[in-house]
């Protein structure tokens, strides 16, 4: 009997492979996971009709595009980021869908992430965001953003990673890798030169090739070549008189030509303007366009999109071949195989404690201690009996508003509540005074905060109450700054002024006079004027840090966490300390009378400062800013010493490694960021005094020391040569400058490139 059973098993086993092989032969190549992806794409394209091809390259709703149901490709869903997954809107309207499962964790704004100077935080950020997106059924997150901080008036700076192309390049890559490791596509934006918001649909940027390649493109290039991003979003603005959603130079020549990008180019919503350019100049997926006279309010307008019926009709009439169409379809199908057709894509989860922990950790590492006179911070919880909290930003929800990054959160802990909880553990009384009234609205696109911030008292009454309470407090902590209302840190418009709004300067000076233990916490994504800096004991840059904002700020202020953030931009004293404003090139010059109200009018904005953005400009002009790029204090002290290199001469195809010793000389555990800048001693072209080319964050216990090494190659020594349209590293003498901020580089090492 046993022998008979064994014979049967062997017979079945012999039959099974042939059946499996037969099944594989019957399986279409485009569904066969054993075949190379490009072969599967070829097969899918060969099976698709013209209508099916057209259908997948434009939107079918506010945030989705069609799949190919006949072949088993599902619909493709995008959603706004980059700080959390935006709540769902109706299929064809911008109103909220009214769902009960589309809350999210709000992660810190990308300025805060950049201020961590820690690529590990970027990876954690991307992974957590990807998991939330998966749970919500999203295939692409519209972010991260890496436009350069050119002017502090840009209403959208809070969504970006600062002024330095090297810092942004290093920080964006792990974010993309973390997000896409979950099978969710990144869509890096806004490519490119979208450096102010006010006239973003009409501004034509005039910039030198050198500045374009050295300042404004490197982070996008890193996103493509190192991050391997699957998506790029075109910007609204024009470059060389072509909109960047269908721009021959930026998309065809640079992105898809020079960088060999194999992903999709997605239009920003309403960013396509021309059929022929949309077809020929690199746009792959069109979203949100208002064409043929249709307005923003038009419904079911998708057939009128340039890459919809107008494109199909033009092909049928012989105006275009299917060559460009098949390239677009190939890229979209490649995206499908990476996301919706990926059988190994994990399951997501939403609002988990691990995600809140990630948000808090990122926030704590990004908060910057700017000033700490007489060691006013951290709050001495052993001696303090009463702490006064002042300011609207101590109680106002900051996750709602700001434009497309507005979120519907499961929870947001305010700074006031965070301090009450933390200080309450030590029996410390926490009092509150409003101090000023700013933006009392709590509604953005149907998402409401549920807060009533109305206060009818006069400015004088509000200040008087705060000052009176401040006189008897052990500490006064004011949470001020900006918010996410229009003309502040908000998409679509720029700030009107560099100064703090709502007469906060007057309140700050009064509080600083009333209590010597006064700490100002600036909540914003931008720098602000600080004419009262010398009168204030402590200054903290608190950013927009999302769901765990109160917890993270309380941890920093009480010393439970040691601040280690560093500024990702130069904090200037006034607008005239930036090239864009010193040279009067912002916001540009209108071509016709009537400005923005004249239909079709274009405003030309010339970046006359060239490569001199941020610290490059202040170095050139010998300006001492309020706070330098890379500046950030700690509750402990560090010594950076003994700079050495593994060689003094470097070949063109070689590398050089610099090593320093970092020691925690204080009494608290903490982290320091070692920054390496390169100075070209003599060059054939004008070069910045120094440029960031390496950094590393190191965590040390009291008394602990470590050697930190940073290796560079000739890329770190190169400039973009306009004559040859290529990067060039000239032989000669260079210096490595090492320290912990752009204005604190005490170590120098000479070397030579030959």
Identify the residue ranges that each predicted region occupies.
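Bacterial Sec-dependent N-terminal signal peptides
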Residues: 1-26
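Acidic/proline-rich low-complexity IDRs
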Residues: 2-5, 9, 506, 582, ...
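Glycoside hydrolase catalytic-domain context in secreted enzymes
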Residues: 17-719, 726-742
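Short beta-strand elements
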Residues: 744-754
């Amino acid at each position: 009997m046993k022998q008979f059973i064994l014979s049967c098993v062997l017979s079945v086993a012999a039959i099974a492979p042939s059946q499996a092989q037969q099944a594989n032969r019957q399986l279409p190549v485009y569904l066969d996971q054993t075949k190379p992806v490009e072969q599967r794409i070829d097969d899918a394209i060969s099976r698709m009709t013209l209508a099916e091809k057209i259908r997948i390259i434009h939107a079918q709703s506010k945030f989705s595009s069609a799949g190919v149901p006949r072949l088993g490709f599902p619909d493709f869903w995008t959603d706004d980021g980059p700080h959390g997954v935006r709540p769902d809107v109706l299929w064809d309207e911008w109103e909220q869908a009214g769902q009960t499962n589309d809350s999210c964790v709000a992660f810190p704004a990308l300025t805060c992430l950049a201020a961590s100077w820690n690529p590990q935080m970027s990876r954690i950020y991307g992974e957590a965001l990807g998991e939330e997106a998966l749970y919500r059924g999203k295939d692409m997150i519209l972010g991260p953003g890496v436009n350069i901080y050119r002017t502090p008036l840009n209403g959208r700076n809070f969504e970006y990673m600062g002024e330095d192309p090297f810092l942004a390049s290093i920080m964006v890559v792990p974010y993309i890798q973390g997000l896409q490791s979950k099978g969710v596509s990144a869509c890096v934006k806004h490519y490119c030169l979208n450096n102010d918001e006010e006239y973003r649909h009409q501004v034509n940027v005039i910039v030198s090739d050198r500045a374009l390649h050295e300042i404004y493109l490197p982070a996008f290039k890193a996103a493509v070549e190192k991050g391997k991003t699957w998506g790029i979003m075109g910007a609204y603005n024009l470059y060389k008189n072509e909109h960047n959603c269908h721009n021959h130079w930026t998309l065809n020549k640079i992105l898809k030509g020079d960088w060999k990008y194999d992903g999709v180019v997605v239009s920003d919503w309403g960013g396509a303007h021309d059929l022929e350019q949309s077809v020929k100049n690199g746009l792959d997926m069109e979203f949100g366009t208002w064409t043929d006279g249709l307005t923003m309010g038009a419904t079911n307008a998708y057939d009128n999109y340039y890459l919809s019926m107008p494109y199909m009709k033009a092909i049928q009439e012989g105006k275009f071949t299917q060559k460009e169409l098949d390239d677009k379809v190939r890229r979209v199908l490649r995206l499908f195989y990476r996301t919706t057709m990926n059988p190994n894509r994990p399951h997501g989860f939403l609002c988990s404690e691990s995600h809140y922990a990630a948000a808090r950790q990122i926030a704590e590492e990004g908060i910057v201690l700017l000033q700490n006179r007489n060691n006013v911070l951290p709050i001495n919880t052993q001696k303090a009996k009463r702490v006064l909290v002042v300011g609207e930003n101590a109680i106002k929800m900051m996750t709602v508003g700001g434009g497309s990054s507005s979120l519907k959160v499961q929870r947001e802990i305010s700074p006031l509540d965070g301090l009450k909880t933390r200080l309450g553990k030590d029996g410390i009384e926490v009092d509150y005074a409003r101090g000023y009234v700013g933006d009392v609205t709590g509604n953005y696109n149907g998402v409401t905060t549920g807060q009533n911030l109305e206060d009818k008292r006069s400015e004088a009454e509000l200040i008087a109450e705060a000052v009176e309470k401040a006189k008897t407090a052990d500490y006064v902590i004011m949470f001020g700054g900006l918010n996410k209302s229009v003309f502040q840190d908000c998409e679509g418009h720029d700030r009107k002024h560099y100064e703090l709004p709502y007469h906060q300067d007057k309140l700050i000076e009064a509080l600083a006079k009333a209590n010597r233990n006064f700490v100002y916490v600036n909540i914003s994504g931008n720098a602000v004027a600080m004419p009262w800096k010398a009168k204030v004991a402590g200054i903290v840059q608190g950013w927009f840090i999302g769901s765990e904002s109160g917890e993270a700020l309380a941890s920093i202020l009480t010393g439970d966490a040691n601040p280690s953030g560093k500024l990702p931009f130069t904090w200037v004293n006034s607008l005239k300390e930036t090239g864009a404003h010193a040279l009067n090139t912002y916001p540009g010059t209108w071509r016709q009378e009537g400005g923005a109200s004249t239909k079709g009018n274009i405003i030309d904005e010339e970046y006359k400062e060239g490569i001199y953005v941020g610290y490059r400009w202040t170095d050139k002009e010998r300006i001492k800013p309020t706070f330098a790029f890379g500046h950030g204090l700690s509750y402990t002290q560090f010594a950076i010493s003994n700079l050495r290199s593994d060689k003094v001469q470097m070949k063109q195809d070689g590398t050089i490694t610099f090593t320093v010793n970092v020691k925690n000389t204080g009494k608290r555990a903490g982290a320091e960021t070692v920054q390496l800048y390169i100075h070209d001693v003599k060059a054939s072209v004008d070069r910045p005094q120094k440029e960031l080319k390496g950094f590393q964050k190191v965590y040390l216990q009291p008394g602990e020391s470590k050697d930190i090494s940073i290796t560079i190659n000739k890329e770190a020594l190169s400039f973009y040569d306009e004559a040859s349209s290529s990067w060039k590293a000239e032989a000669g003498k260079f210096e490595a400058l090492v320290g912990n901020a752009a204005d604190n580089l005490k170590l120098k090492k000479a070397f030579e490139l030959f």
